Each structure stands twice: as structure tokens, then as C-alpha cells.
């Protein structure tokens, strides 16, 4: 691996383990689905929260378990590493529709045996019209049916998925063990006054919590016995000793508190794993790993029971295990989540709650371990602040140079004040972590999905506003309509139509999300996830009922740069310079710039109009003005947990479009910026491909003009450089200074880098067998280049290569 020597290499066993996991083909796995079906059938008379608890118990007590020969940690999600379990309680629709198509996909391919197909066919009738998707769709009001039919909001990720974008309270889990949670639950249950109506529901919830804690304990004990049995027949003395130690640890954690670093790692892994067996979610993150794990690391290093080498090997094992967790999405959902990402984020760095630099020895070790494994999971985020340890920052740049898109950098200087402005307590704001792509939250205290998952496609909404409320792709009416572009006399007329249209579309997106959230609350209340999030046990309710301390949702906006460039082209070339008439532009858009005359118009739009990403106030201010309409509207709408316990319960903006720029682009005709129909939109808040001509500083200045303090859901900025650009110490220091300027002076939110050449990507597309290990940053996550669809690969290849 290029530049790998700086961080050292994996031990031989971990290198072998890594290779074994990477070589595994991802198969569809029916075991969980069969066990879940049995549990639901056996407990149809029970309240749904009890059904969910008994389902998890059934799965954890009966699923296949194994311990890999090279692993130091126990715990698996499916019958084989990288297999994707099916979660029928969410949906079976896409599974059955795509049963014979999983292996034929352009990207995100999964394999499936005939036996598995038959197992899924056998259980499918039970789940027909009896799952989250069916109930969510049944709750949708008629006025939003057109949006579901056309898929304009991209709701696949919400209809088919479980808990997402959170980190449980790992610090408390390690300190108290699940035993502490059990004792607290029993005490509160015993104190219930059943003359109070709410106590009836609390009692059921507490019973469910006790069931899942016992189930987790049983699951860990199964591994303890397995390791002991394996030790009996193991002939290698060292491995025998390791298996006996695994057995001892699994008998203890996570039920009992952890007392060593190795116990803490195993406890964290068990919880991280089981949360992704309980629920078909994603972005279930590790939180501030270097902070809550440091006391165990420090103690063991000081007493001599842990060395730097053994800690590294244990962490690299954990990250390899993290990669084994998998999820199959519908073909439609892969358009916005390409590369089978799980978004399991590990956050390091940042500040302590008393505002000091939080970097410690473990921060460096985590960085080194991620560099050694060089995988797509976990998703590593470093919290930057003005006084970040210089040596640590240097090492972050060295990891970037390895070219696998990590770490991403989030900026304390804007994120912490933004949280405080929304009502988050200062000590909690200073303890935030990344929980997915660029989204951020307070670990162990945040509601069950901080991301809305209904995309507001800005360019498509603009076209709708220009066409009196009728969508040009589907020919369906989306909004009331506020005029035709060809009849709008001034730019202000267009802006007024945009304002009303985007507000109306935002309202509809909220209706869709609320209906699905209501269905999710009633149908798939996840007990373990709730129990491990403060203060669900204290309130006696699930996370989806408002059990968390905080609960905010960020909407997702797609095509920000296309919107900016479109507005600039219209204002400058049509209304100000009058080089193009309104009718000419409209006809060219409808023609997809195909005729010779319309190709000339396209050329003018691309070459003569100001472009977002070049520090040009003309275009940058236009998009801020348009964006404010959305931000002003979205904050009006509470979520379904509002005034039910959590602080917040409201919505704010976010640009974490993941790979939805590709999928949303496929549903969007040509746009006034000169983009052709059905081509990808710009991703995140990044400029459109090759529109940024003035270098990285200009991009940073443009992005910093966005109302970042209101976009607390994340301002995702992707940048791309060739490895040669960072081949000298001088350029490395230039990049550091550039990032410091962006964060310290311009108050940028986030930045991440693809350090890979266009030539390498093109060669990988032509000769995938030569580049099996090539990892790229897609959006707020990394993926193996070869598993992406060609359209997504092309989108990444087309990004501008920056120079320093």
C-alpha cells in the first residue's frame, strides 16, 4: 500500500484476517428473517414493543455464531461475514421484487442461493401488507400521493430502514454494564403507580427492556461457551490462551462493567453489533471513541497489561469486524447510498467539556489503526478546533495521503455554537460526535434519526416553479403554481415563484416524513437502542416516542451548486444582459440542448454565467437568498417527538446528500446552468464539476457564505487532489494552513479529501481486477470503487482536481 510505511503495517494475522473478509462475497442471508417471522407469529397478542423485545431475544438465542480463527473479538451479524440479513418487518416488497436481480445489478451487487430464495418465499406471505412500509404508506394523506408515485422525495431509505444516525451512551455502558441499566429499570418498574394511565405503557416498556438486556447477556454467554469449546480442541498454545481469554471476557461484558481496554473493546463491539441486528438502520456510530475508551487504555498502559502493539492489533481487529456488518438496500435506494455504506462513524479529537484540547495517546493510536486497516469502515471523523494538537493534525494529513478518503474534518468552531443556539446545553455541545456522514449529534442523548431522508431537489423545484407548479419529468402537478417563466417579467418574479414553490414542497416533505415516523413509532419500536439512549429508561418510553434528551431532524437538500449556477445564468444572461430570451432558454431546456442553436445557448450558460465555487459574490449571494426560503420554512415544522420530552423536536437544514446527487439527477431534466437531462447533480455543497476555476481557497470562501449556523445537519464539502500534490512537505503544510484558514477564519463546517488521480480512477473502471483495494470518498463516506455503479464512478471521476 502506497505511503503505508509511515504508520507501519498490520500484524500478519490481521493482514490475513483483513484479506479473508475482503475476499468474502456478500450474500443475502435469510436466517434473521426466519427467526423474526417465528417471533412475530408466536407473539401476535403482545404489545408491539414486547414483540420487538421477544424478537430480538429469539434471534440472539438462536442465530448462528462463530469466532474467526484470526479474530481477537467475538460477535457476528449473519451466518457469514459480509452477508446481509433481511429485515422483513420493515419491508419484503423490494426483496421479493429483486430476488432474481440482486446479482445482476450494475453496482451494490449481492449474491443469493436458491435455498435462501425459497426461505424468503416461504415467509413472504406473512409480511404482505404487514410491515413498516405498508403501514407507512397507508398513513400518507392523499395530498402527498403524487410525491410517492414519482419518488421525488426519495423516501426508500426511510420506508425500508430502521434506527439511524445516533450513537448510544458507550461511556455509561462501559462504566455500569447492562447490569446497571437492568437495576435502574427494575427500580423504576417497581415504583410505578398504575392509577396513572401512562404507567401501563411504561410497565410494558420496562418489561421489554429487561428482556433485551437478558437476551444480550445470553448472546455474550453463547460466545463465551463457544470460545471455551474451541479452546478444548485448539492445539496452538497461544491461540488456546486467546480463546480462553475471549471466553472469560464474553462471560463478563457487556453485562458487567468493563475493567480493561480489551474488555471495553469487546463490550463496545457487542453493542455496536446487536443494534444492527435489532434494526435495519445505518449510521449507528461509535461516538467519541478516544474519549470514553481512554481511561481503560491509560490504566492498562500504565500497569503494563497493554502495549502499544497489542492495542493496535486489537483496534485493527475491531475495524475489520466493523466491515463485516452489511445491509442490502433496494435498487432505488442504492441510487442515494451507493457502495453498500453503513456509515459507522468513529470520532476522535475535538475538545473536552471544559474546552481543552481532547487529543490523547489513544487518539493517535486510533488514527494509526485506521490507517493500517485502510478500509471503508469505520467512517473516521476528526473534530478540528483552533488549538488542535499540531502533531495530531500532521498525522491526519498523513492519513489523508493514503488516499482512502479519511479522515473527514468537522469544525468545532461553528458546530458547537450552532448546537448551543438550538438549545443544546454547553457541556453536551462540546461532547458532540459525527453520527454518519457529516451529521452531528450528542452521543447517548440524541433522537433516533437526525436526518430527514426526504430530499429537496433544488433544481427540480426551481424547474417546477418555472412551469407553474407542474413537474417537467413526471408531468404531474406538484404545487399550486405561481406562474410560467416565459411570463415572468423580472428576476424578482422568478424568485417569488421559487420562494412559494420551495415552501410548499418543504411542507409536503414534512407531511411524508411525519406519516412514516408515526408508522415507525408504532410498528418498529426498538427496545435496546432506546434503553441505551438517555433518558428513555427515565421517561419510560422508546426513543421514537420522545425518550431522548435531544431530538432534531435535518432535511436534506440536493443540487445546491446547480441551483446557484442556474439562478446566476438566468439573472445575468436573461434579465440583465438579455443575451438569451426567456423563451429561448425555456425551449433549450425542454430540448435538452440538442439542436445546434440550443447547444450554443448551453455553451453560453456554461461559459458566460458566474459559477458557484469561485468566490463570486454575484452567484454566491443568489443561492444564499434562495436557500433562506427553505431554511425559514423548514424550521416551522416540529417533528413527531415535539413537546413529548426531548429538547428540540424541530427541524433544520443539512446538505448531506450522500450519493443522491446521482439518483436525483436521474429524475431531473436539463437545468438552466447548462447541465444535461438526467446527469448527476452537484453533491453536498460542493461546486458543479469543473465549474470551480479559481482553486481551493475560492471554494472555501464560497462555501463559507452559506448560512452554515442554520445548516446544523451538516455542510458536506468534498475536495479532490492528486497524490502528487501532497508529495512534498511544503505542500502538506500548505494544505494544513488552507484547512486552518477555512475553519478558523471562514468558519467552514466540514471538508474531506479524495487523494487519487483521475488516471487511476479511469484505469480502475477499465481494469477493476487491478484495483480491488481502491477506496474513494463518495460523499460523507468511503466505498470500494469497484462496487459502485458506473454512473456513480463517472460522477467521482468528473470531480475537479484541486492544486495548492
Name these PLM-found stretches.
Residues 2-206, 242-245, 249-804:
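Conserved catalytic cores of very large enzyme subunits
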Residues 207-219:
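Extended non-globular scaffold/tether segments
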Residues 227-228, 297:
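Generic hydrophobic alpha-helical segments
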Residues 230-240:
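A conserved hydrophobic secondary-structure block that centers on an alpha-helix together
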